[in-house]
Amino acid sequence: MRGAGFLAIWSDVEAHDLTDYRHWLTREHTTERVTTRGFLASRVFRAARDDINRFFILYELEAPEVLDGDAYLARLNAPTPWSQRIMPKLGNFIRGGGIMVARAGRGEGATIMALRIEALPEDPATLARALVACDGVAAVQIGATDEARTSVPTTEKGMRRNEGFFAGLLLIEGLDVASLRGALQRARAIAPDVMDHASEPEVYHGMFALDARIVDFG
């Protein structure tokens, strides 16, 4: 990630809506977002499980101020017809954004764990460095959620029943699932106060990515 800010979103999609949802994401929604001032890139992941269609979206932002900036709020208050059809159908919707407080490693892993945490580590940089030192881990990022900036009432927010809240994001990017499991075990050993209150450690695989530098603005 290049920017100081982030926006993280989890949601579930029913099987009969899956094609429409994927087309909406890749053919309209992520393009709309990354052409909004302050958005740098979008990455879409799908959970590695067969019982549910669960997705994780990570947006890279120039700064956390983008979250309640005029450009993004204008988008949120003018959802497209396609967005109006899709958004009310999303289940277990969780959304939050803020500032990245620690990064370690380089590049992006095709396989990730994106954990919601309820307590930030006392020293985020030290935890990030310890986890990225694990075999097969490419990068680790830790973010702090800004509840005020992500709680502004908007038209889109009104289409969803609930967005939940989480204090922070722990993103571990690996070369394979075994690498992620090793890093998870390490995190539990050195930061039990953080991991004891983290969300389920699901594995996600990369599905789609779009960078504002290469998007078709025409």
Report residues per predicted region.
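Macromolecular interaction modules
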Residues: M1-G218
